[in-house]
Amino acid sequence: MEERKHETMNPAHVLFDRFVQATTCKGTLKAFQELCDHLELKPKDYRSFYHKLKSKLNYWKAKALWAKLDKRGSHKDYKKGKACTNTKCLIIGAGPCGLRTAIDLSLLGAKVVVIEKRDAFSRNNVLHLWPFTIHDLRGLGAKKFYGKFCAGAIDHISIRQLQLILLKVALILGIEIHVNVEFQGLIQPPEDQENERIGWRALVHPKTHPVSEYEFEVIIGGDGRRNTLEGFRRKEFRGKLAIAITANFINRNTTAEAKVEEISGVAFIFNQKFFQELREATGIDLENIVYYKDDTHYFVMTAKKQSLLDKGVILHDYADTELLLSRENVDQEALLSYAREAADFSTQQQLPSLDFAINHYGQPDVAMFDFTCMYASENAALVREQNGHQLLVALVGDSLLEPFWPMGTGIARGFLAAMDSAWMVRSWSLGTSPLEVLAERESIYRLLPQTTPENVSKNFSQYSIDPVTRYPNINVNFLRPSQVRHLYDTGETKDIHLEMESLVNSRTTPKLTRNESVARSSKLLGWCQRQTDGYAGVNVTDLTMSWKSGLALCAIIHRYRPDLIDFDSLDEQNVEKNNQLAFDIAEKELGISPIMTGKEMASVGEPDKLSMVMYLTQFYEMFKDSLPSSDTLDLNAEEKAVLIASTRSPISFLSKLGQTISRKRSPKDKKEKDLDGAGKRRKTSQSEEEEAPRGHRGERPTLVSTLTDRRMDVAVGNQNKVKYMATQLLAKFEENAPAQSIGIRRQGSMKKEFPQNLGGSDTCYFCQKRVYVMERLSAEGKFFHRSCFKCEYCATTLRLSAYAYDIEDGKFYCKPHYCYRLSGYAQRKRPAVAPLSGKEAKGPLQDGATTDANGRANAVASSTERTPGSGVNGLEEPSIAKRLRGTPERIELENYRLSLRQAEALQEVPEETQAEHNLSSVLDTGAEEDVASSSSESEMEEEGEEEEEEPRLPPSDLGGVPWKEAVRIHALLKGKSEEELEASKSFGPGNEEEEEEEEEYEEEEEEDYDEEEEESSEAGNQRLQQVMHAADPLEIQADVHWTHIREREEEERMAPASESSASGAPLDENDLEEDVDSEPAEIEGEAAEDGDPGDTGAELDDDQHWSDSPSDADRELRLPCPAEGEAELELRVSEDEEKLPASPKHQERGPSQATSPIRSPQESALLFIPVHSPSTEGPQLPPVPAATQEKSPEERLFPEPLLPKEKPKADAPSDLKAVHSPIRSQPVTLPEARTPVSPGSPQPQPPVAASTPPPSPLPICSQPQPSTEATVPSPTQSPIRFQPAPAKTSTPLAPLPVQSQSDTKDRLGSPLAVDEALRRSDLVEEFWMKSAEIRRSLGLTPVDRSKGPEPSFPTPAFRPVSLKSYSVEKSPQDEGLHLLKPLSIPKRLGLPKPEGEPLSLPTPRSPSDRELRSAQEERRELSSSSGLGLHGSSSNMKTLGSQSFNTSDSAMLTPPSSPPPPPPPGEEPATLRRKLREAEPNASVVPPPLPATWMRPPREPAQPPREEVRKSFVESVEEIPFADDVEDTYDDKTEDSSLQEKFFTPPSCWPRPEKPRHPPLAKENGRLPALEGTLQPQKRGLPLVSAEAKELAEERMRAREKSVKSQALRDAMARQLSRMQQMELASGAPRPRKASSAPSQGKERRPDSPTRPTLRGSEEPTLKHEATSEEVLSPPSDSGGPDGSFTSSEGSSGKSKKRSSLFSPRRNKKEKKSKGEGRPPEKPSSNLLEEAAAKPKSLWKSVFSGYKKDKKKKADDKSCPSTPSSGATVDSGKHRVLPVVRAELQLRRQLSFSEDSDLSSDDVLEKSSQKSRREPRTYTEEELNAKLTRRVQKAARRQAKQEELKRLHRAQIIQRQLQQVEERQRRLEERGVAVEKALRGEAGMGKKDDPKLMQEWFKLVQEKNAMVRYESELMIFARELELEDRQSRLQQELRERMAVEDHLKTEEELSEEKQILNEMLEVVEQRDSLVALLEEQRLREREEDKDLEAAMLSKGFSLNWS
């Protein structure tokens, strides 16, 4: 520790930290220059710079980064940096792609210079990241620079942050970066090369810049512009007018904001209802919208022009886009209002304030972009040669391929192109010939536009610059050098360019020409003659008169599908009937739209040749590859069925689109078209079919119309097949449904009844104008222009594959509005819509958003108040002139351009100012965050860094307390219950916000961990779950569907919960501690990774992360804190009260809590208030006074003056507020509150203390109550907060376990202990540096802080004590959770003196905090798992873990604010027991605290009260019956919330284990007897976890593993088990360490804290698996066992890990990993979910069966009186149920522990007794199952979220492609009409029968058919997506519902469940049918398409560049 201590004083290390933490471009460059100057390094020496820097900077924080960069640089492709040693490169633009390219080139050994014309990174816009980009950036050390990088479910990052990350990496690698240098052109080498060999140079501004002298041979354009470098021709894809609006709002990181769900892309085709509601409410008409929560709230939306005109954003309508979007034509104020309104509505008015961030001109950050034209370069590179010097010119990023933003392809494809370019430069440098280099580059580039997350290689770890590692089926030699000769420019011949281009086109698209042969009429005619040969009455001689009778058409159909037509019955004379029959069958069965009616055909003299060519071409394309039925007479029935299906099934565009680089992607290619022929039709049918199924017969009309729609067009012909199939499917689906004949004709119905008044096929049904063949569409027997085919209600353009038709009034509707057709609603609504678009629209919006008549006024007003600039800027902006570029650069209107003149005068706002305004909340915590992240840059950082950072956030008060308070209150009012509101009020809005921030941060961090473990999808869910878990206990009680309640509450409380996260403040403390711990841990962890022996921190980090996660869990608990949280608090209080009879208030609460959680929250608030006011505290904390007397560890560590100071610092008022809303307050007071928190913590401890009123330190609980903190109002205020900041709270925590405190103090408190802790936590030291300020604010002196950090580790010190004997770690958590327990553990560890002394918990604050966090998380998990139980046991736990618990449950913390109610008379022993335990066996004392926490059940006397309380709880929260369910929810949240929590779910159980600590456990273990006497009071708890129970748990886990179908899930579970075991082992090892200091203690500890033993058990070889599985699988069981206290897999492992990491870096890291692995089980869960998604039914079965089992088990548990409080109480009943098993398990674990840690039998006995004490909290099989179920549910939720995001992105892609198709069709129609007019002589030139024109006509017809098929494929894909999405949502809902036992549901609920199941089965059927068709087609195409590469190429080049 000493080394690290001094390390931080090393100026180089300080400078490095400053560099890593820099938040601006200039700041980064300056910090780096200072670092280089100090180290005397010169970046100019690029070859050795990095190695010199590495050798000179021997800093543990930097080593983690070196390890990552060394790993990347060691790849074989880089040839150790010698691949490009003499290559000089210039890169234009320091954007993400330019910098990414520079990094790879530098690793190749090239000299790289980057020039950037600005010196600020000001783009707040957020980029979506594909999984491989996240992996890639992590490999470059992104987490080292930006701790929050892709935390949790987050898969996006702001451009600014991404640039900063890459800039820092580039600088470290020795890349020269010059800012304020603008590239203006290339300077060719002079002709006179004899005198001076000068090569290519750049013309830059300023001209005198040294870069102007730089000669290079490679130049790469990465500035995003279209014309920077010459020679690149562009392909343009013009889609529908697409106007994108981006807006950035300030993110204050409040809880309210944290709970708003992101919108990862809502595409209109995917969720039409949302957009229609938006339009009706606000008049805003969007095509899609995306919302990402990053440094800012980032929105990007595509607005429809008409909507912008209606809302006054665009003043005048111009056809020219440049004029349309010119600055003069845009009302900036209206634009701001539009963006704000859309953002407000899309987030359901949940964002408290929408204040615009500012751009780099100080204007509101809103911009409009024209996405109508997307450009892609035709080639990626070229070579120029002048005067003997060759120059390789390349493009990357947007300059190469412009992305369509909503699809998130920009960075992904940009990075792929960057790596491809690096590979090209490598080949160039290795001497490959220029043409070969170019040919390879272009071969690779053709695949780039087609890449999707699904069709790139999935093995991200193998990615390198070699394209083969990234593109699955790439042929790098696809193009030959001769085909790219035109890209070699010698400046001599310009003609070669054109020649070569034509050559390339002819060579590269061999298949495009294949269809041209069809263009010849003779070929088509010949085919028709062959098909009709032999049919009576049919003689085809031409393409007109031969077809008039209709027999020829019927003959072709009969030839291939004799089942459809009885040819022999046809009458040659009945022309109309024959033709109509053929048209109808072709449309219905084959998907070929008619071009006229039978009546028309009969009436015309000669059928129109052009029309017939178009119509017959579709038959040709459909059947050309099929065998006629006559050739299939020898086929069996099966084969025939397949054949028929082949003409029906939709093309499998789906598979091509998503799975492989699409061969069919580009409908343009003719070959493609050929290939698609058959499939296209099918697709169409499918798409319609998809829709049809949706309608069902009742909606059939809609379907019919839909089907009709399918008759896409003449071209659609084939589609109709699909439609037909759809119809068939529909019919199948609807057979059971009542047929509804609303007048809407089924698609299948023949449309013989053509209206007589129709003008025929050449007159538009809608506009009555002429319809030319090429532009003709037909549906329902009507013909019309494509542009006229609109919804009667909303005027949206319809597609043939998706419409509804009302036969009665002959009107067409989009499906969503079909229901309005009869109601007159349409008439009413339509007009309304128009007004809506005006101010009226604003009105409704305002209502929704609580705005004034000025739809935006209120929001604007408030936002303006907050950001005065926004309004003003907005006004100014309208005048801003748009910047027009001479070249067609993308038209973008950025607000800063006030006018052309003003623009010049406009001054750029410094980046710092911009950041300060936009990121105030982030930056406040940012510095610390950054520090934390930088200091723990190790993997831990990666895994848990976010957590640290997030906590830091809370310290900053973003908006000012009053504003924040207002916001908080507003949020609370909006989404919280009254209780929640009260809580929030008591907390104080400011604090709330901070807490919210913290919570958000913490959640993110938690998520980060989760994500790292489970990947991004789950994190989001985690958050929700956390919030949900935080759901009001009351609600939980009341709501049978705990999960739903949780979700609802989660949402409602989110603000409160977040605020409870205010615990966030504690989190902050935790964060600080975590930072201390975690950063060091991270750092250490990384070091460990690097092999640094001092990497203890790494594990700590993990632990911290876990702790953080628990914090998150706590947060979850807290989240509910306002409502649920408070309820929880009350519940806990009630439990505490039961524990502490002394506190009548609490006792009252106990029952009242159970009965009226609402009141509880209020009381909680009061409690918090007491915390606020010492006087209140006094009475409420009477027991606390004892603790106070004892002095919270903090006080002990820090003189009282300090504490008071801290309290004042804590902003006693704020703290009071915080106390009011414990959770919220905490965040606000975080730093200060933390210190006060420690007193507060004691307060929470007081419940324990109350429980054990005895003044002895042991009754930490009681003592803590009396603890100084209790006296100190500030601390009281901070209790909640400090809880979140367990480190600080840790002190109180220590007091809680006074003995522990003493021990800790001895350990931590004593200088030696502190030093030891410090050594263990160099990271802590670093953290200190980072959190020194926080600590100071907390009131801790830096020294104290350092102690704290040590103690932080001590918390881990606590843990250290725990760590030494791993049980201690648990015990610390137990301490955290059950302070007494931890204390006793320390005693066991041999910290007997801590018993009396208040532990130096304050010192271990951070660690303690962490522990607390872990404990809290455990508790939270407990609370989540036990729900009320948590609260009940929580009281003691609160006392003990008030810090951690407080953190974890702000609500729970409420008791801390007010001393927890005295334990019930029986329970009081909890504290006493703790004392006893501590006294008898030090560890023993500690365990009792846990029992205190969980003691209720454990304490026999208290147990009945607890059970009663729990019962009341259960009664109040009906869930108690499923306390497990509650646990589930909590667990889910917890797990989701934090990885720790996940394991902590079992921790939740820990408290329970504490019960098991009771003699029963000991007895079971056989050691109990010894401990029994000591722990006899806890004996009741004994049954908690027995060895048997553990075995059961393990077996259960294994069984689950077997039942789990997903291999990934199974693996994850196995990993978790092993991890748990490892962790336990690790904890065992750490314990031994502690044991070394206190061998007996270590041993004692293990017995002492069954939880620990459980952990140990897990650790133990014997119990490892069991414990692990138990912990993982059935945390309850684990909990019951030693896990109960800490064993819970996550909790225990997390804590043990932390401790171990404190003491043994390596192990910590491993443990960390195991933890991660442990998490993986959840991940496996996710995998399971994925599998489930694949096989919905089986998945549901597996998941649901799990649930059911769990539920049943839960029910059984519930049956036990205690069960209701399944958390802590899970009670004696359950514990009793599994006492023997648990005892056995515990014995085993203890045995293993003893084996592991040389625990003496006494120790083991002590442990068993402790275990037994905890054991009462032991989990029964059901509980374990319930926990596992919860885990699976969580994983499932995360998986579902991930899948949902994927679907959304796919939907966006489809939407974009449909737009492109529409635009292409429009252009084709224009050309087709012109050709048709010429052919018909209508062009004024007379009738021309020009063969060239006819040839052109054939080509156009084919193209149109291809487009129609392509569109139908897209629609099928969209339909499949829709069904998939629906199924997923139903599945999730069903899963949530089935998590509740049937007997708890009402009839209505059961019937709803049945309905959902039925609907889901229907959807599954539809999907199965659809997928079967698609798969069939896919197989056929594989047969047909042998030349995949060629097809890809054709598609690639004609591909739409989205």
Curated annotation (Swiss-Prot):
The sequence motif named Nuclear localization signal is recorded at 663-684
Q: Which residues form the Calponin-homology (CH) domain?
A: 518-624
Q: Where is the composition biased (Polar residues)?
A: 1150-1163, 1268-1280, 1288-1302, 1436-1451, 1760-1769
GO terms, biological process: actin filament depolymerization; cell division; cytoskeleton organization; exocytosis
Catalytic function, reaction form: L-methionyl-[F-actin] + NADPH + O2 + H(+) = L-methionyl-(R)-S-oxide-[F-actin] + NADP(+) + H2O
**Phosphoserine modification sites?**
649, 685, 687, 977, 1134, 1143, 1160, 1192, 1274, 1278, 1310, 1337, 1371, 1384, 1433, 1649, 1701, 1704, 1912
Q: Which UniProt keywords apply?
A: Actin-binding, Cell cycle, Cell division, Cell projection, Coiled coil, Cytoplasm, Cytoskeleton, Exocytosis, FAD, Flavoprotein, LIM domain, Metal-binding, Monooxygenase, NADP, Nucleus, Oxidoreductase, Phosphoprotein, Zinc
- Amino acid composition bias (Basic and acidic residues), ranges on this chain: 669-679, 1041-1054, 1191-1218, 1407-1422, 1588-1604, 1657-1668, 1804-1820
Which Gene3D superfamilies does the entry link to? Answer: Calponin-like domain, Cysteine Rich Protein, FAD/NAD(P)-binding domain
Return the Pro residues bias intervals. Answer: 1239-1258, 1456-1467
**Coiled-coil stretches:** 1821-1992
Protein name in UniProt:
[F-actin]-monooxygenase MICAL3
Q: Which organism is it from?
A: Homo sapiens
Source gene?
MICAL3
